[in-house]
UniProtKB/Swiss-Prot annotation:
Post-translational modification, as annotated: Contains 2 disulfide bonds.
Signal peptide: 1-17
GO terms for cellular component: extracellular region
Subcellular compartments: Secreted
Name of this protein: Venom family 8-like peptide Pr8a
Assigned keywords, A-Z: Disulfide bond, Secreted, Signal
Record bears the keyword Secreted: yes
Keyword Transmembrane tagged: no
Organism: Platymeris rhadamanthus
Source taxon at top rank: Eukaryota
Tissues where the protein occurs: Expressed by the venom gland (anterior main gland) (at protein level).
Amino acid sequence: MSPIAFLLPFLLQMVLSTNVSTTSNNGVTEIRLDNKIVDLTKATVLERSKCCTVYRPVEDSSCIIVSSKHGASMVNCHGSVSISTSGKLSAEEMAEFNSLTQKYSG
């Protein structure tokens, strides 16, 4: 087997991977994909519930973002999942966020 064939899966993963960063402070969440701040006002809404919204950002259309009203977020990009919470979530909001996170993290 040639060295290139052996390294190809690793090289593809490096090329296709997205650097994900989420931070929350006092209920305000900032999400970055490859060091660019995600603008959720431009993202496609995939699902909306009472407490949470699921987005597909224009910055990387292969990513999924679940965002709650009070500062919880989950970002799934190329199988890499990042979760951040801040602020106070009610039991209902936390249950809804957890349900959507499970649905969209796989």
